[in-house]
């Protein structure tokens, strides 16, 4: 609910300007690492708001900002490959933190399209 309230307050709700991005993609919900540590795919900690093409233009966001829309197959593959080698919950938390920073501020650190 907090995410919706934030979008409403900022004038973003149902305007097609932003979309919620699952940091660990939903396709990995049954991955052994995700299941082993009981990672909640729908928790707010697994979501980041990313602009759409329309949002990037209207909100006048910085150049290089990741755009959410369509598929991001390279990202999903990358996340799956890293999940394959994670052995501790601490590693999983560190990886999700790394992905959040990559999605928001350092897109050069993660593959996208």
Question: Model segments located where?
Answer:
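Catalytic toxin/effector domains delivered as secreted proteins or via bacterial secretion systems
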Residues: 1-113
